[in-house]
Swiss-Prot record:
The modification Glycine radical is found at G681. Activated under anaerobic conditions by NrdG, a tightly associated activase. Activation involves the formation of a glycyl radical at Gly-681. Exposure of the activated reductase to oxygen leads to C-terminal truncation and inactivation of the protein, by cleavage at the N-terminal side of Gly-681. The presence of zinc protects the protein from proteolysis and prevents the formation of disulfide bridges within it. It comes from the Bacteria. The gene is nrdD. Zn(2+) binds at C644, C647, C662, C665. Its EC number is 1.1.98.6. This is Anaerobic ribonucleoside-triphosphate reductase.
């Protein structure tokens, strides 16, 4: 029986004795040994040794050749063969993918790697160190950790194994809601310091910044603090009591007025410091923490003060140029009877949120009733759009804080449609096959966390960030079971999928095509519900943000299928279920088009609208917000807030495939402009940290959503 040879890259090829003979002859020529018969004999002996086996490793063959040569009469030939093998290994390594990617990083020539994440400044050493570690982690995971069919599917672009530079090499998870309340009230240990419950709002926000930095260094996705205004309200009370006590000790006549004034100032300063801290931090991942603050539901005066402080600081901007802060992402909750309409007690806070959104794009809004309807309970998204389902502890209490998402695998839907060649039945068959593969890939994320001990991430598992206080040698996997954690199937390109399958009319303009798009997402939802039932894990459907993926999938599909009109011709794929960015509709109709999808993909979603400058037309923006309240759970506002520090222009810079330029003076010096765009769910500063080519093209093609006589 002739064996198969397992090569270094994992491929299997038929065994051929001729290749052994050729390698020995090349070494013989280098050693000036003129004995072809001897070389043929050695090759024959080694071939005989390999017979009868199913599979042999390439290194076994080479070692057998070396042993045979060293026992023969030509020692110089043995030496030449060993040197030849060594030189070949070095040359192969230089040509290898790992070496090429490292060289692309060191020489700053690999644009796709350098611009993969708009939040990472690949020009600085800490980020380069993280990128280098990521290159190695990806390589090792592909070669040694993941099943071969999963790796091949990822490489082809059938699926995308997100964050392969971190997981599964490291036992890390994606995003989470920090149990900040538990940590601050019970105390915790961080590094060498024992942290006691803070005695003021300024101390509480300082500690919060350190918690964010630590947590963000132990996970690879977004870090969210849910209902931060309510969590930190007791520390505002503590500050007030401290200032009141000072006033009484010093016999200040209006002790209450003094305490109020000092508390307002301290709270504003505390959240200013927190915003600066977040935007100047670099985590161990080489980036500013992807952090989100959810707020808006608090009714106490302390919670209201926190809400105002967060919004007024964001409006004020960062530094001498008052730049728009990219982080934290702000998510403002709106609830009827609280802050939704005139007469509601916190309606004034909503007005401040509208002003902030018109000037700084954030906050995005969470519509309370819709969030509960779609996800089962109210909570802030983890990161930019990942939503947890309902989970109750042993006491029957709904718990959100301390929970997390284990990771995402995304499907390339347009590729399936292209492979189906317009045949809908073939599409559904291929989709079911890909779903089997996606589930297998997702299960590797779960398996990677089995047997992992709490000591690998004390801040998460031992000090309360995950809502638990485990011992160092406790297994962490138990806290991810029974739906406590989510794990998500993602998808991209509903728009291109419909085009590839049916062509012709735009999906927006055809009710039947709309129904086809919804049906695809319904099938994905059925799959994750089935997986959840079968495994007990919290499988969910997630509308992938696709900052990098919009470019990668399209690039791979263009190489495979060519430039296909309406599919691969733009250089990017449309984000999840979103309306084509070039389709000119009003914001209300865009909401209506996208509204059917969040209830299906309730593990992750966002809707947004593109607007002109609306700083002097807040009523128009409020009208859209109010419309969204009845239709979608989560809504974002994109509006031009670019600034030129050369000529003073404010508004929207010209977006080209090469970058952004001031329309007034032509300035495109990144150090003399401020450009802010929504990357996916987060904002980014593409002037300083460029988007990848596909995302840049998508941003360039975005049109404003105008109409109904309200906007524009």
């Amino acid at each position: 029986m002739t064996p198969h040879v397992m090569k270094r890259d994992g491929c299997k090829v038929p065994f051929k004795s001729e290749r052994i003979k050729e390698a020995i002859l090349r070494a013989a020529k280098a050693a000036e040994v003129d004995d072809a018969d001897y070389c043929a004999t050695v090759a024959a002996v080694v071939s005989e040794q390999m017979q009868g086996r199913n599979q042999v490793d390439i290194n076994e063959i080479q070692t057998a050749v070396e042993n045979q040569l060293m026992s023969g009469p030509y020692k110089q030939l043995a030496r030449a063969y060993i040197e030849y093998r060594h030189d070949r290994d070095i040359e192969r390594e230089k040509r290898g993918r790992l070496n090429q990617e490292i060289r692309g990083l060191v020489e700053q020539t690999n644009a796709s790697l350098l611009n993969e994440n708009a939040n990472k400044d690949s020009k600085v050493i800490p980020t380069q160190r993280d990128l280098l570690a990521g290159i190695v982690a990806k390589h090792y995971a592909r070669q040694h950790l993941l099943p071969r069919d999963v790796v091949q599917a990822h490489e082809r672009g059938d699926i995308h194994y997100h964050d392969l530079d971190y997981s599964p090499f490291f036992p890390m998870f994606n995003c989470m809601l920090i149990d900040l309340k538990g940590m601050l009230t019970q105390g915790f240990k961080m590094g060498n310091a024992e942290i006691e419950p803070p005695k003021s709002i300024s101390t509480a926000t300082a500690v919060t910044a350190q918690i964010i930095a630590q947590v963000a260094s132990h996970i690879y996705g977004g870090t969210t603090i849910n209902r931060i205004d309510e969590v930190l309200a007791p520390f505002v009370t503590a500050s007030y009591n401290k200032h009141r006590k000072t006033a009484e000790e010093w016999n200040i006549p209006d002790a209450e007025g003094y305490a109020n004034s000092r508390t307002i100032k301290e709270c504003y300063d505390a959240f200013q410091s927190l915003e600066y801290e977040v935007n100047t931090l670099h985590t161990a991942n080489g980036q500013t923490p992807f952090v989100t603050f959810g707020f808006g539901l608090g009714t106490s005066w302390e919670s209201r003060l926190i809400q105002e402080s967060i919004l007024r600081n964001r409006i004020a901007g960062l530094g001498k140029n008052r730049k728009t802060a990219v982080f934290p992402k702000l998510v403002f909750a709106i609830r009827d009877g609280l802050n939704h309409k005139k007469g509601d007690p916190n309606y004034d806070i909503k007005q401040l949120a509208l002003e902030c959104a018109s000037k700084r794009m954030y906050p995005d809004i969470l519509n309370y009733d819709q969030v509960v309807k779609v996800t089962g309970s109210f909570k802030t998204p983890m990161g930019c759009r990942s939503f947890l389902g309902v989970w109750e502890n042993e006491n029957g209490e709904q718990i959100h804080d301390g929970r997390n998402n284990l990771g995402v695998i995304s499907l390339n839907l347009p590729r399936i449609a292209l492979e189906a060649k317009g045949d809908e039945a073939t599409f559904w068959k291929l989709l079911d096959e890909r779903l089997v593969l996606a589930r297998k890939a997702l299960m590797t994320r779960i398996a990677r966390l089995e047997g992992v001990k709490a000591r690998v991430a004390p801040i998460l598992y031992m000090e309360g960030a995950c809502g638990v206080r485990l011992n160092a040698d406790d297994d962490v996997s138990e806290i991810f079971k029974n739906g406590r954690a989510s794990i998500s199937l993602g998808y991209i390109g509903i728009h291109e999928t419909i085009n590839a399958l049916f062509g012709g009319e735009h999906v927006y303009d055809n009710e039947q095509l709309r129904a086809k798009g919804i049906a695809i997402v319904e099938r994905l939802r059925q799959a994750v519900d089935q997986w959840k039932e079968e495994t007990g894990y919290g499988f969910s459907l997630y509308s992938t943000p696709s900052e990098n993926l919009c470019d990668r999938f399209c690039r791979l599909d263009t190489a495979e299928f060519g430039v296909v009109p309406g599919v691969t011709d733009k250089g990017y794929y449309t984000n999840s279920f979103h309306l084509d960015v070039e389709k000119k509709v009003n914001p209300y109709d865009k909401i209506d088009f996208e509204a059917p999808y969040p209830p299906l993909a309730n593990g992750g979603f966002i809707c947004y609208g593109e607007y002109p400058n609306i700083q002097h037309n807040l009523k128009a923006l409020e009208d859209v917000w109010d419309y969204s309240y009845q239709h979608v759970p989560y809504y974002g506002t994109n509006t031009p807030i670019d600034e030129c520090y050369e000529c003073g222009f404010t508004g929207e810079f010209e977006c080209t495939s090469k970058g952004f330029t001031c329309p007034k003076c032509g300035n495109h010096d990144a150090s003399r402009v401020s450009v802010t765009r929504r990357v996916c769910g987060y904002l980014g500063s593409p002037d300083a940290r460029p988007f990848n080519a596909g995302k840049q093209e998508e941003v360039k093609r975005r049109v404003k959503h105008l109409g109904n006589g309200q906007i524009g």
